[in-house]
Structures are given as C-alpha cells and as structure tokens.
Amino acid sequence: MLISVFAGAVGLAVHVVFLFSIFDIYFKSPIIHGLPAYEVPLPAPASRLVLIVADGLRADKVFELQKNGTTRAPYLRSIITEKGSWGISHTRVPTESRPGHVALIAGFYEDVSAVTKGWKDNPVEFDSVFNRSRYVWAWGAADMVHLFTKGDHGKRVFACTYDNDEVDFADEDASRLDTWVFAKFEAFLASASTNKTLKHMLQQDKLVFFLHLLGLDTNGHGYNPDSMEYYENIALVDRNIKRVVQLIDEYYQEDGKTAYIFTSDHGMTDWGNHGAGNPSETETPLIAWGAGIGQTRLSGKDGYYDGYSEAWNLSLYRRVDVKQADLAPLMAVLLGIPIPINSLGLLPVEYLNRDSHFRAVALLTNARQILAQFKQQEHNVQETTFSIFFRQFKADAKKIELTEMMETLLKQSRYKEAVQVIEKFIELALKGLTYYQKYDRLTLSIAVALGFVGWMTFVILLLLRNYTGIMCKSLESQSKKMTPEWQGKIKILSSSTLVIFLSIQNAPFMYYFYFLIPIVLWTMVLYELDVYYEAKAYLRRFEVKMWFLALAVLAVLGLELLVITFFYRGVMSLGLVFIGLWPFTTQLSKRMSVAWLAGCLALGVFPLLPVIGKQHNYTLCVAQAESVCLYHTLTLALSVWQRGSFSKANFFHVLLSLRIFPLIFYFSKTSNANIEHKEGLPLFNQILSWLLLVLSPVLCLFSTTSLFNRLLNLTLSLLVPFLLMCIFYESLFFLTLCLVMFLWICIEHQLSGSTLRLQDMTFEYQSSSTQAKNVTYHIKIDDVRKAYFFMFFMLVAFYGTGNIASLNSFSISSFYCFMTVFRPFTMAAILLIKVLIPLLIVSCAFRALLQSIRVSNTALFLLVFIMSDFTALHFFFLIKDSGSWLDIGMSISHYLLSMGMFIFTAVFHGLAWFLTTFSLDFSGHEFKRHLL
C-alpha cells in the first residue's frame, strides 16, 4: 500500500510538471511588454476603417459561382472585379473565434496557454489596432466584441452586443443575428444627427467601425456550410454590406476617406465544425476596398498554383494571399496609427494604392516594430544567461548587412528595391525572434527527457525489487548499494548547486522544477542500484539473456505499435488482429479462442470506418437499440438460468433500462427532426434528456455487487446517456466493446486456473490478508501482456469512432437532445462524456479482471505507467511548432493524451472501483448505504 501511494504521489507530481513543460519549451507567449510604438511618419491614406468579420465564412463559399453561373455575393464580387483587392487570408490552428480575432486585430497568434480559458480570454493583456485608434464602435456577439474592451483605460471602445442566449443552433433564422448588427449600425449613424457629441467624434480621424457577424457561424454549425440557410445568409450579408457602404457615403458625403476590409476569423468543415487545420477551416476570404486600397488589377504571374482562382472564375483578377496576422499592420498603416507592438504580421504592401516611397517607409516602420521585439527578446535572454554561455543569433552579421542596404537604397530613392530588402530583413528578424523564443528549448528538453527516463527507470527497479523474486542479496549488489546518508548528501549538494545557478541567472520559477526533478529521480535510482546488479546476476545465473532480449524487443515493437496508432487510426485494426490470434498460443479452449478472435475482428472494423462527422442514420440507431434490448434480455435470461434466481432490484433495474431505450431513440429522433424543420428543441425532450444523463449512471448502484450482475447493470446505466448522443454507429461500437471486454474477463479467469466460478464472484473490498498476499505477489510475463492489453483497449475505446487527431470530428448534432444554444463549455462537457463512457467500460472490465484473478493492482498499474510514459517520451520530441497547423495541433493532442494516461488511468480506476463496489439499497423505509 505504501509503495502504491508513494509511487503515485511522485508520479503525479512528475507528470503534472512535465505536462505543462511544453508550454515553456515549445509555446511561450509571444507577448513582450515595454516595447516602443512605431507609426508611419506620413499622412494616413484613410480617416476611418470599416472592419467586417463574417464569423465562420469559408473562402470558397463566397468566391465560387453557383451551378447556374451566378454568384451568392454579387456586391462583393463586383468589388473584386471593379474597384478593390482580394485574396485568401490563411489562419492558424486553433481555428476558433478568439484566436482568429486576436490575429486579425492584434497581429499575433495566441499562445497555447489560452486554451485553459477556452480560447475566450488571454492570460496577458495585449496591444491591438483598437487600442491605438482614436475611437472604436463595435457591434456583435459579446464574446468577441468585449475581447478588446478589457484594459481599455482610455474608454475609446464602445460596444453594442446581444446576449449569448441569442446564439441558438436550432434557430429558425440565425441570420437575424447579422440583421441585428446591420440595423444597430444604421440606427447608430442616424442618431449622430441629433447627438452633437457623437457627431463631433465621427468627424475625427483614426476611427474604426467593427461589425462582427455571427449568423454564418451559427447556421454553419446548425445546418452545415452546404445548406441553403448558409447560402442565404451569405446573400444577406452581401446585401447589407452594400447598404453599409451607401450609409457611410451618405453620411460622409463620399469624401473618399473610408477604407473597408471584409474577412473571416476562420472557416468550417463540411459537417459544420471548426478548430482543426483543414483547408476549409484555415482559408478565409479577404476583400479590401476604399481609401488607401489598391484598385482591381488584371492578373499577372501571382505564383498561386492551387487552382482556386480558376475554379472560382477569378483568374483574370490579381489575387494576393496573406497570413491572418498581416491584416493588423495593414489596418494600422491605413489609419496612420502605431502598429500593435506585439504584431508579427508583415505589411502586405500590394494592397496599398500608394507610391513606392510610401510603401517603403510603411514597410520600414513595420521592420522597426518587429526589430524592437527582437532586441527586447535578445536582451531578456542575455539577462538570464551567463555571458560565457550566451549563444548569439548567428545571422546577426546578415542583419547588419541588410540594414546598411536598406539605408543606402532609401537614400538613393530606390524604393522598389528597398521594399524587397526590407521584406528580407523582416523575415530575418522574425527568425531571430523565434531563435530567442526557443533559446532554452534544447536544455529544457534534455532536462525533461532525463526526468522521463529517470522516472521509468525508478519504476522498473521498484517493480523488480517488490514484485519479482530476484532479490537474493548477492555480494556484488550489497557492495554497490548506496547508503541513505550518501543519497541525502548527493541530493542536497546537487540540488543546492542547481538552485544557486538558476537564481543567479534569474531563471523562471518553473525552471527549478524542470531541473530539480531529474536530480531527485536519478538519486532515487542510484539508491536502488543494487536491484540492477541483482537483475544482471539473475540473467547471468540462469542464462536467459537472449530470452530477455527477445522479450524486450517484442515489448518495444508492441509499444511502437501504440505510438503509430496515434497517427494512423487503422493500425488499431491490425493490432486487434494480433490480439485476436493470441489465445491460440495458450491452453485456452478452441471455442473460447474462436469467440475471442471473432470479437476482436468485429471491434477492428470500427477504426477502418470513416470518423463520425455529419453522417446521420437514425434507422441504424433504432436497429442498434433493438439489438441492445435483445442482447441484455438474453443476458438476463442466462443469468437467471445459471444462478437459478435473480434479485428483484436487479430485475427491476434491467427491465427499467430496457424500457428506456426505445424512448431514448424517440427523443433523439424527434429532437433532431424538430431542429431540421426549424421548430426548436422540445422542452420535454430536453428536460428528460438531462435527467437521464444525470440519474442513469446512479441506477447501477442499486444492484448487487455480484460481478456479472453489477457489470450488466453498469453497462445499461452508461449506455442510456451514450445513446442520447448517438447519431450513427456509435452504439454498435459500444456493444461490441462490451462483448470483447466480457470475453477478456472470461479468458483471463480461465487462464488463471481459479477454482471459483465467475458467477459466484463479487466486487468486494479486499481484506487485509488479501492485501498482504498481493504485496508478495511476483509479476509474470503474462502480467505485462495484461497491462498492454488494457492500454491498447483504452486507446481503442477513445478513438474507436472518432478522429485520432482531435475531437473536431464530432458532430454538433450529438448534443441536440440536451441543448442548441451556444454554450462552449457545456457542449464540450457533453461531448467529453460521450468520449469517456467507453473508457469507463474498459476500466470497469479491468477492475473485474483484477478482482477475478487476484493479481497485484499496484504492479499492473506500474506496468501501465511505464508503457504510457514510453509513448509520452516519443510525443514529447515529436511536438511541432512549425509547419502545417494541423500537424501542430495533432502533436499537442498526442502528447497531452499520452501524458494524461497516467492521470486518466488512476482516475478511471478509482471511478470504476466506486461504481463496482458501492451499493445503495432500499429496505422498507430505511435507506442503507454500505461499502462492501
């Protein structure tokens, strides 16, 4: 028991620290404070800017022609062909609203730590175009508009928003959200005629009008981007943008000082989701016109070979693509305000209609603003590094050379050549900035890797000492064993030296943990060094080196297979084939071996199926419900036949669950039908769905703790909320997984040679004598296999119906039985429950397995921890912060999942223990609660 608690406490601390280490190593915040502001020292091209962001609008949907050859957005298309500039704005992962708006208006890509606040807030205040403007008026959703009112000490941002409750995915007409914005804007301009203060403010320069349009995002989620609702919403936006331009021209008497930018924060998948890095999510439209914006130009060689322009019939008009963050310096230059100090955007000079001199000066201002970040970051690194260890950016000489070239070209008025040199200079400065942001990466990575290896080595030695019979105390091991006194001296000396070294360098607080943890772990390993020599002597004494080497190679190959499954979902099917063939190498009966193989092959079909996206098949769902009812009816009959009796509580629970299943699919089908017909979510369905979600898992606690009965009731209890979220083949996967878990329990029990029948076993709390027996338990090679199977089935449960990259593939209709109003955290919680229910089934089956064969829980979980950390170490070095945004998101997800296996395993085992051993019982009028 003490071993389990100690290893668990140390392991939890290590994993929590290393879990967050990637945010210091790979994803540091790009925000630097105390920087100077730079603005173009020339007259501004525009006095005001209208920024229109159509949330969730895909580039192809607004640019492409319909089947009849007409466009969905005639006004916007006329701007492209007659008086403006256009292109694609490429966003970054995560393709969510907040990061997209921050990139647009502040010019930098948010650090991943913002995910802890649901991408709804940033841990650090930041500069933006709005901060630098004289006045900003914003209309739209509160979540987006109020992003930029935080820290508005100058009271320059005036927000007009609607409540989040208005965002309903089942709304009959979600485009009314956009109509509301346009109506408020029109009323705003009309009120200026009677409001002298407002009229005076509107006559100033450096003004921004921000229109956030959420209708397209809402319709896309509710009906998908190929729906008529989405297309009609595009047409509505197009008509109202034309009206906005007319209103502004009338108010300002066509003074030609208004610039317009129309874009989107992110796109959307075909099934109505966003968040990942598919092209449909990262490619958004950009159309700019008005003051300071270049006129329509016929296309020359623009360097784009993706075929988009031709497909959209726009190849005649020059296209200029940008990164989303590039729009912040563009807006700042148009208004003549300082570029946001943390902006990483490169000014797209081709969008400006000014001469080459203005372009060169504007781009030079952009270069100075980025160079200021570079110098400050370099200074920060120097402040925390000993001069003898400081490694300067290698391209500093190139930077000096480019600086001299810029100055020479500008003096000679060779502005076009100067623009090219300045762009190279900015590119170099950005590389230097990235270099210093990653300055400590190698050192920290080595420290974390040493910590991983130290932890795994310590756990292996712990297993060898306490759960094997190799400790015979040979003379060699006794002579090599470190005394506690020496262990303490080494730990204190090394830790003190490191702390002094880090404090002198003013290292961040978390760095102490990253460097101290490996020292502590390896000191513990040195203390257990006698185990290593005993193991070596054991291998030498019994001449099993080659056998051990072969097993080690097999184990590594098996773990590498786990790593590959994170990248290629179908590999799980191959693994299930091998696992299905395993019983044929044992003494198991042929009938059971064939049943196991059939179950594994059936389960292996699901990773080969497409991930569940926008597909709906409620007929299949009903058929699955009938199969579930039949399966559990047969199970109930079998239990009565084998035991000769069945408790009233169990019978009532099973009967109640079976009667609920048809109702579940009725609610699910009617809820989705009502939403599709724009009739909204029925209140009765919603209330009952929430009640079933909360109360159903509790029903299993009223059954007895008999192993089979409790598992049957637990399966039914968890299946009820799971079915409420099913839209395709998920329940069939759930049923197959339950069947395989049942077979696994039976097989392991038969192989254990236990004389006690499974039907007679209960989930009882282990007595002290049993625990004492488990302390002296010696692990076998078969136990390594059991731990591997558990980890493999956990991955199958997690990714059996979903996308291996992220949870992005889940359809929003999965929670239509519960809600349609936009509540991101509640929606995420519901989807998380859907994902975690199969994991809980595997954990409960593993709990039953451990109970039936009486092995040491601690030993098996230590084996699981070693395996999960082996995969985590892989993903730690496979994390990416460059390349495609999809790859970046996948690498983070893989690492977090593999690291979370340690915590998930412990949490799910504890939850499984509670659900299998805890009972609630009614006896007369007395309510009893007992823990067996």
Name each region found by the language model.
Residues V5-L19, K28, A46-L51, R58-K206, ...:
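Active-site-proximal alpha/beta segments of enzymes that process anionic O-linked groups
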Residues L51-V53, V208-H212, I261, I287:
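Structural motif
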Residues D55, L104, L211, I241, ...:
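Divalent metal-coordination and catalytic microenvironments
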Residues S4, D24, A37, P41-A44, ...:
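A long, amphipathic alpha-helix that forms part
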